[in-house]
């Protein structure tokens, strides 16, 4: 399992490849520049459309109330931002943050067109170097984005720093399937069908191949839980969804 516990190494995984540390951000940016216009379709293809149910369940568990301040990291096209903006109301605030300008632009245009305005900010942000003061947010979410972060340990430490005491991190991410037969079927789909769907939908087989590989290289459920605790979180737990195709990790700062 590849983790970022030791950043003394000079290379890191980019899917199944090893690239120099400083190149991963650029390569990930290239992937999401390519898929930004078809991102929602991509999520449907990767999850059989079930990502909406996973996100809805995460939102219900968030406990967000009017007046809360939320940071939606790797916010993409704004699915979670939209839901949280409605829940925090006029007295709250949601920040849609993404390292990729193309994704921020798609999210901003989509939410503006849907009338989600007035309590949402948009920013290009690196999760490893958040520009917010300590103790700023009631909730930080990162949905289907942590696996693309170069230094996950640093990002988790930064998230912990900007959370208010009593605040919560929610990580919704593809994880390790717990049922052996389903795991084999999902692997076959990910590596044999998903890239071909990417070619068909977006004329981009390589980006979809990377996305499949990035899921395989992401820390498993227990490893990510341990990483959260080592980053400073006082409590961490996870909930498997769809037999572990996705896991929802939650961490609290007391």
From Swiss-Prot:
CDD domains membership: AdoMet_MTases
PROSITE patterns reported for this sequence: SAM_MT_UBIE (PS51608), UBIE_1 (PS01183), UBIE_2 (PS01184)
Any Pfam family the entry gives: Ubie_methyltran
Assigned EC number: 2.1.1.163, 2.1.1.201
Record-linked InterPro entries: SAM-dependent_MTases_sf (IPR029063), UbiE/COQ5_MeTrFase (IPR004033), UbiE/COQ5_MeTrFase_CS (IPR023576)
Keywords assigned by UniProt, alphabetized: Menaquinone biosynthesis, Methyltransferase, S-adenosyl-L-methionine, Transferase, Ubiquinone biosynthesis
Coiled-coil spans in chain: none
Reactions catalysed: a 2-demethylmenaquinol + S-adenosyl-L-methionine = a menaquinol + S-adenosyl-L-homocysteine + H(+); a 2-methoxy-6-(all-trans-polyprenyl)benzene-1,4-diol + S-adenosyl-L-methionine = a 5-methoxy-2-methyl-3-(all-trans-polyprenyl)benzene-1,4-diol + S-adenosyl-L-homocysteine + H(+)
Family: Belongs to the class I-like SAM-binding methyltransferase superfamily. MenG/UbiE family.
Protein name: Ubiquinone/menaquinone biosynthesis C-methyltransferase UbiE
Naturally occurring in which organism (per UniProt): Hydrogenovibrio crunogenus (strain DSM 25203 / XCL-2) (Thiomicrospira crunogena)
Name of the gene this protein is made from: ubiE
